[in-house]
């Protein structure tokens, strides 16, 4: 694509169409943009547009498109072509910093993100001058530019907060500190001076406080891994100024908005985080500054209002106290009874109250409320912070804290009892306080795993929770109902089974509540209860115990999907999946009705897939429906195909990328259930599955390979007879997969199925080429994974076609190659093979080579006979060799960049491990003994003499054991 006006005009038109809400306009535009993004100059055209277009919407759209392009394509993946040409890479890096700094803020943010994505790959080795270029801009005095630099630095360095320690990381941070720490400190001091100079200029202060917030975030990132010497030497400068900013109260920066945090709150929040970091990790060095920070933060907490805009500040301030009170160093600051009472009264209880803003979120923004309350993304909420502070205080003062809080709980419950209609929020706070007081350790899987023994959870459940669960009006006091459900959910491991069984039918009735939060919690609680393990590794709650409620449970779950706000509720769909899995054959009578509802839902969500978890559980539920029903009656598979194929066809025709991996897995499951030949409906689809475009997407590869394996297993002969022209396409897929380090094992899965299931004559003409491709890959890139797969394939070939055929095909490629493969690959590497089936294939294949290949007895290959036998006995008896060569780096298959749908394995579409040898060989050791006996009978004296001269004593002893077990001997 040339950098010319015509191309800029075309790109502008398609970007505009890509914003169109009408999918018939938008989708083709997106497809066009996708099709041209591989062209050289495409990213430069986008940069030109975002710099020069007269239309601001197009500029922003170009910036977002550019950032997403970089996200998808910048990383260079081994075995794959470079998606951004080298000239484009050079031009982008040469211009992007300047462009970012001269752009308006909306565009600046997108380009800043793009720089950090590029930096993640290229900095520092391939972009050594990035930091220097950025630091020099600090001298510009223009805070629009300075803030652009700070924002970019923040997005570049914030990964230091969660990266694992490594020498590479240390050297990068050291380079950053050497270049950046001093200019950042100078900028910090200069900005604070400017704040004093412009103390009455609100516009100047807004810009300066934005800078201070970014500087404080950078301080956090650069200090997270370890305390750098530079910051230790300059601690006085940083901490004195942080303390000054924490106590600053500039009326000009106060906002009228009750929701949105202002600049002052954001800055103080970050400073609280910075102080907490030092208090936790560098307490010795921080000790001189700690008392004044504790005082400042305490004063901040008792003087800050309940408005939402202060939530982040208050939660970070409380988190600071929580991190301090957990450290033995600072225990003395909290041990006084009056201090504990004061903390409880002035900090914890006020911040556990259910405010009108929380009530609004509960009613009007339920998705966000659930995300925060259930999924632990409440990290910056007041309640979560107050809860953490309670836990922190209980570490050293469990008795006194429990006593103080119990008094508050009792008084709150007494207030509620006086007038439940008016005072229900008191009970809500009491439940939350009990929960935070009782919870010592919690996991997503088991709920509370360790509880405060001073709190009687069962008694509280009976006296205060059960009444809300039993209430006939599920729509009355929805917050308290949600609290009660959550109590059951998080204390499920502490409550006795009879209480949980009592709760189950009550939870089922709450699935019909109008409140989204309430019916979502009910679904989630049921799903969690159904996953609890009982004494014999079975489920705690059994299908028999669920029998009286099965119909109502299924009805209410599916009805709740029709409630406003829950059409794609992932918790409900997960509960449906778990219910199917728990009840098994008990759901069969209901499946004919439910499958219609599930397929209808699938059709709806496929129009615009937006809830990945919901979609995943939906497909899992479909798989369970198929497996459970067809287990009892395999013939019913056709009724599922009738229900599902029309929807699947639409998904395939519309290329709904997110759903293709799922569709292929469900189709595999259906096809694998067929007992005889392959149905014609599947054969019609077969050619389409070989289209190269499908194989370009990483997420499609594992499920497509499995589907092709199912085709080969059920219809190898049919393919050979009626679709022989498609065999080259099938082998083309194998060739593509085998060339990739990430996917070569998938190529072998496919190849093994071809060898096992295709009629031998149908692939005779291709066999030699297959081996040549494998040798080329061995020469260019020999990895442990490849060798293990290669060994399994070679031995499967020996099992399927015989040892003579194996020897002949090797030697037809190059004379004496069979010996080279035995000596260089099979003998030294076979011990690396893992997996029972894989080991069995190798054992049977090698046994055939040892006993059914005349060349092993009468040619120069004879010298390899005993080492090969020794290697086979090693495969049987020695531990698996799991060493990996020093020079082989780990290939991270999962971490594929960009917007490709990652492969989502469906747990309930699980494929049984296939044993191509099956019952033909029960015990490979016995087979070896019998085969050696047969060989020795054919050439008496040879085998014992070969064994006695060169097999080591230990291996010989093992072999004697095999012969005895098989009741045979060598002659």
UniProtKB/Swiss-Prot annotation:
<dbReference type="Pfam" id="PF03378">
    <property type="entry name" value="CAS_CSE1"/>
</dbReference>
<keyword id="KW-0963">Cytoplasm</keyword>
<dbReference type="GO" id="GO:0006606">
    <property type="term" value="P:protein import into nucleus"/>
</dbReference>
<feature type="domain" description="Importin N-terminal">
    <location>
        <begin position="29"/>
        <end position="102"/>
    </location>
</feature>
<dbReference type="GO" id="GO:0005635">
    <property type="term" value="C:nuclear envelope"/>
</dbReference>
<dbReference type="InterPro" id="IPR013713">
    <property type="entry name" value="XPO2_central"/>
</dbReference>
<dbReference type="GO" id="GO:0006611">
    <property type="term" value="P:protein export from nucleus"/>
</dbReference>
<keyword id="KW-0813">Transport</keyword>
<keyword id="KW-0653">Protein transport</keyword>
<dbReference type="InterPro" id="IPR005043">
    <property type="entry name" value="XPO2_C"/>
</dbReference>
<comment type="function">
    <text>Export receptor for importin alpha. Mediates importin-alpha re-export from the nucleus to the cytoplasm after import substrates have been released into the nucleoplasm. Negatively regulates fluid secretion and plays a role in fluid homeostasis by down-regulating cftr activity.</text>
</comment>
<protein>
    <recommendedName>
        <fullName>Exportin-2</fullName>
    </recommendedName>
</protein>
<dbReference type="GO" id="GO:0005829">
    <property type="term" value="C:cytosol"/>
</dbReference>
<dbReference type="InterPro" id="IPR016024">
    <property type="entry name" value="ARM-type_fold"/>
</dbReference>
<keyword id="KW-0539">Nucleus</keyword>
<dbReference type="Pfam" id="PF03810">
    <property type="entry name" value="IBN_N"/>
</dbReference>
<comment type="subunit">
    <text>Interacts with cftr.</text>
</comment>
<dbReference type="InterPro" id="IPR011989">
    <property type="entry name" value="ARM-like"/>
</dbReference>
<dbReference type="Pfam" id="PF08506">
    <property type="entry name" value="Cse1"/>
</dbReference>
<dbReference type="GO" id="GO:0031267">
    <property type="term" value="F:small GTPase binding"/>
</dbReference>
<comment type="similarity">
    <text>Belongs to the XPO2/CSE1 family.</text>
</comment>
<dbReference type="InterPro" id="IPR001494">
    <property type="entry name" value="Importin-beta_N"/>
</dbReference>
<dbReference type="GO" id="GO:0005049">
    <property type="term" value="F:nuclear export signal receptor activity"/>
</dbReference>
């Amino acid at each position: 694509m040339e950098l010319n006006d015509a191309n800029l005009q075309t790109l502008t038109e398609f970007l505009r169409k890509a914003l169109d809400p009408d999918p018939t306009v938008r989708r083709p535009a997106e497809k066009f943009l996708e099709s041209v993004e591989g062209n050289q100059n495409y990213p430069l055209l986008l940069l030109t547009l975002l710099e020069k277009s007269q239309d601001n919407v197009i500029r922003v759209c170009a910036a977002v498109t550019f950032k997403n392009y970089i996200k998808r394509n910048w990383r260079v993946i081994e075995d794959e072509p470079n998606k951004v040409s080298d000239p484009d890479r050079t031009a982008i890096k040469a211009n992007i910093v300047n462009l970012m700094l001269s752009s308006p803020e909306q565009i600046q943010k997108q380009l800043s993100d793009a720089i950090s994505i590029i930096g993640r790959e290229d900095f520092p080795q391939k972009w050594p001058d990035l930091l220097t270029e950025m630091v020099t801009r600090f001298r510009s005095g223009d805070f629009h530019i300075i803030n652009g630099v700070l924002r970019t630095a923040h997005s570049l360095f914030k990964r230091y907060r969660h990266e694992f320690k490594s020498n590479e990381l240390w050297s990068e941070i050291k380079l950053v500190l050497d270049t950046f720490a001093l200019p950042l400190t100078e900028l910090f001091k200069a900005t604070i001076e400017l704040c004093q100079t412009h103390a009455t200029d609100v516009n100047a202060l807004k810009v300066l406080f934005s800078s201070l917030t970014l500087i404080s975030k950078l301080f956090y990132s650069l200090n997270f891994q370890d305390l750098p010497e530079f910051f230790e030497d300059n601690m006085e400068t940083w901490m004195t100024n942080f303390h000054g900013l924490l106590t600053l109260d500039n009326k000009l920066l106060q906002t009228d908005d009750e929701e949105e945090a202002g600049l002052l709150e954001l800055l103080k929040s970050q400073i609280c985080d910075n102080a907490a970091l030092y208090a936790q990790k560098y307490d010795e060095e921080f000790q001189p500054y700690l008392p004044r920070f504790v005082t400042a933060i305490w004063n901040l907490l008792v003087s800050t209002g309940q408005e939402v805009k202060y939530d982040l500040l208050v939660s970070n301030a409380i988190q600071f106290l929580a991190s301090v009170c957990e450290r033995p160093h600072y225990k003395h600051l909290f041990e006084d009874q009056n201090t504990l009472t004061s903390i409880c009264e002035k900090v914890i209880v006020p911040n556990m109250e259910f405010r009108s803003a929380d009530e609004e979120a509960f009613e009007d923004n339920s998705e966000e409320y659930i995300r925060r309350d259930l999924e632990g993304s409440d990290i910056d909420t007041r309640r979560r912070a107050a809860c953490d502070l309670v836990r922190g205080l209980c570490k050293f003062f469990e008795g006194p804290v429990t006593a103080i809080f119990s008094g508050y709980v009792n008084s709150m419950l007494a207030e509620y009892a006086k007038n439940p209609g008016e005072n229900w929020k008191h009970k809500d706070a009491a439940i939350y306080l009990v929960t935070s007081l009782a919870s010592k350790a919690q996991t997503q899987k088991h709920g509370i795993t360790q509880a405060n023994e001073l709190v009687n959870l069962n008694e509280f459940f009976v006296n205060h929770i059960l009444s809300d669960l039993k209430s006939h009006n599920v729509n009355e006091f929805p917050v308290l109902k949600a609290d009660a459900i959550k109590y059951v959910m998080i204390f499920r491991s502490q409550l006795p089974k009879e209480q949980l069984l009592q709760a189950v039918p009550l939870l089922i009735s709450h699935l019909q509540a109008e409140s989204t939060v309430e019916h979502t919690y009910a679904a989630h609680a049921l799903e969690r209860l159904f996953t609890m393990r009982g004494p014999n590794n079975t489920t705690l709650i059994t299908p028999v115990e669920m029998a009286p409620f099965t119909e109502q449970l299924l009805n209410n779950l599916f009805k709740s999907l029709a409630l406003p706000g829950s059409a794609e509720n992932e918790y409900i769909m997960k509960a449906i999946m778990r219910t199917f899995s728990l009840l098994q054959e008990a759901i069969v009578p209901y499946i004919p009705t439910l499958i219609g509802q599930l397929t209808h839902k699938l059709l709806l969500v496929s129009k615009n897939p937006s809830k990945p978890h919901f979609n995943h559980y939906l497909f899992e539920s479909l798989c369970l429906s198929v497996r459970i029903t067809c287990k009892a009656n395999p013939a019913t598979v056709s009724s599922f195909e009738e229900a599902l194929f029309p929807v699947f066809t639409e998904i395939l025709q519309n290329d709904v990328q997110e759903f293709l991996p799922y569709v292929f897995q469900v189709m595999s499951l259906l096809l694998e259930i067929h007992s005889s030949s392959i149905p014609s409906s599947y054969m019609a689809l077969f050619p389409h599955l070989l289209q190269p475009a499908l194989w370009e997407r990483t997420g499609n590869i594992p499920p497509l390979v499995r589907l092709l394996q199912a085709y080969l297993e059920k219809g190898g002969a049919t393919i050979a007879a009626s679709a022989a022209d498609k065999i080259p396409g099938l082998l083309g897929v194998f060739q593509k997969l085998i060339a990739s380090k990430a996917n070569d094992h998938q190529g072998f899965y496919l190849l093994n199925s071809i060898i096992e299931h295709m009629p031998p004559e149908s692939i005779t003409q291709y066999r030699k080429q297959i081996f040549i491709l494998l040798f080329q890959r061995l020469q260019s890139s020999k990895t442990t994974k490849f060798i293990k797969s290669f060994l399994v394939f070679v031995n499967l070939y020996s099992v399927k076609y015989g040892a003579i055929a194996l020897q002949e095909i090797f030697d037809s490629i190059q004379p004496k190659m069979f010996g080279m493969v035995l000596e260089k690959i099979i003998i030294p590497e076979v011990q690396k093979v893992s997996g029972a089936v894989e080991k069995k294939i190798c054992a049977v294949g090698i046994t055939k080579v040892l006993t059914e290949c005349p060349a092993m007895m009468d040619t120069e290959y004879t010298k390899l006979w005993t080492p090969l036998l020794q290697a086979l006995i090693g495969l049987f008896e020695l531990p698996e060799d799991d060493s990996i060569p020093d020079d082989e780096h780990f290939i991270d298959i999962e971490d594929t960049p960009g917007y490709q749908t990652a492969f989502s394995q469906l747990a309930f579409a699980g494929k049984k491990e296939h044993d191509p040898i099956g019952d033909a060989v029960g015990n490979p050791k016995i087979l070896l003994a019998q085969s050696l006996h047969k060989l020795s009978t054919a050439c008496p004296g040879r085998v014992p003499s070969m064994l006695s001269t060169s097999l080591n004593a230990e291996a010989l002893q093992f072999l004697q054991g095999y012969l005895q077990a098989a009741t045979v001997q060598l002659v």
